[in-house]
Amino acid sequence: MTKTIMLANPRGFCAGVDRAIAIVERAIELYGAPIYVRHEVVHNRFVVDDLRGKGAVFIEELKDVPPGSTLIYSAHGVPLSVRAEAEALGLTVFDATCPLVTKVHVEVKRMNKAGMEIIMIGHAGHPEVEGTMGQVDAGIYLVQTVDDVATLRVVNEDQLSYVSQTTLSVDETRDIIAALKARFPNIHSPKKDDICYATQNRQDAVKLLADQCDIVVVVGSPNSSNSNRLREVAALKGVDAYMVDNASLLEPEWFAGKRRVGVTAGASAPEVLVQAVIDRIKAFDVTQVTELPGVEESTVFALPPALRPLF
C-alpha cells in the first residue's frame, strides 16, 4: 500500500525558541564557555545536547553556578526569587524568557498591584507556571482542569482575574475559562489572550492535518508542553497520534494499513529532526511528501542589547 506524508504548516521552531537558542549561542561566542543556563533553555533533548556540546551548562539551582559566572534564564521564565538570588551572587545575567511569557508576567504584576487575586491556568510543576506564579508573593492560585474551578476558594470574587500558561491546548483552556466565568461572573480577563500565536497556529495546523490523515506523528520531547498538546489535539480528531523525540522511536507497525501519514513538530523541535522522521517513514513505502498550506509566521524577537552584533 503506497503512502503519502503530509506536513503541517507551520511546525517546529517559534520566534521565542529561536531567540532563546541564539542567546545561549551568542553568549558562548562573546563570553566563552562555560555559560550556565537555569533549566533546559527549551524543552528539546536534541537542542539541549547540542548547546551542551558548545559549552552550555544546564543547572536547576543557582548554588551550582560559580560566583561571577554568566547565567541565562530559560525561555520559560523564572520567579522573582531567582532574579534576586542571581543578583546577590553577582552573576552576569541574560534573560531568554520568551517575550510572550514576559507579557504574562507583566499582566500578573499589574493585576496584583490593582488588588486582585489571580487564577493561573496551567500545569503544576511546569517551569513557566512556576515562573509566572512567582511574580507575586501571594494571592495567586493554580487551576489545571474544569473540575478544579468548582473547588477553588478565593477571598473576594469581585476582585478576581486570570492568566494562562502560553503553551496550553486552546480548546481545553477555553473550557476552563468558560467555567471560571460561570462561577465568577465578575472575573477580569487579561488584555489579550495568553495562548501564544505559535501555540495557536500549530494547533490549528495539526487539526487540519488530522482531518486529512490516518495517523499523525508529532516530533517533540516528552517534557515539551506544546508538543504534548499537539498530540492530544490530533488524537481528539479521532486519528492515531504519536509523539517521538527522534526518528529512532518510530515503530513500523504504527503505519500498517495507513495511507496518509501526517507529520508536525512542537515549537521547540528543530526541522532537522522532522526531516529525519520523514526519511524514516519513507522506508515504509511512501511515494510522495506534500506540505499543507498554513499561516506564514514572520515574528522575530530581538536579542538583549549586549548580545546583538555590532553590524
Curated annotation (Swiss-Prot):
Protein name in the entry: 4-hydroxy-3-methylbut-2-enyl diphosphate reductase
4Fe-4S found in the keyword field: yes
Keywords: 4Fe-4S, Iron, Iron-sulfur, Isoprene biosynthesis, Metal-binding, Oxidoreductase
Binding site for isopentenyl diphosphate: H43, H76, H126, S224, S225, N226, S268
Catalytic reaction equation(s): isopentenyl diphosphate + 2 oxidized [2Fe-2S]-[ferredoxin] + H2O = (2E)-4-hydroxy-3-methylbut-2-enyl diphosphate + 2 reduced [2Fe-2S]-[ferredoxin] + 2 H(+); dimethylallyl diphosphate + 2 oxidized [2Fe-2S]-[ferredoxin] + H2O = (2E)-4-hydroxy-3-methylbut-2-enyl diphosphate + 2 reduced [2Fe-2S]-[ferredoxin] + 2 H(+)
Record keyword Oxidoreductase present: yes
Lineage: Bacteria, Pseudomonadati, Pseudomonadota, Betaproteobacteria, Neisseriales
Binding locations of dimethylallyl diphosphate: H43, H76, H126, S224, S225, N226, S268
EC number assigned by the record: 1.17.7.4
GO molecular function, a single term: 4 iron, 4 sulfur cluster binding
Pfam family, any one: LYTB
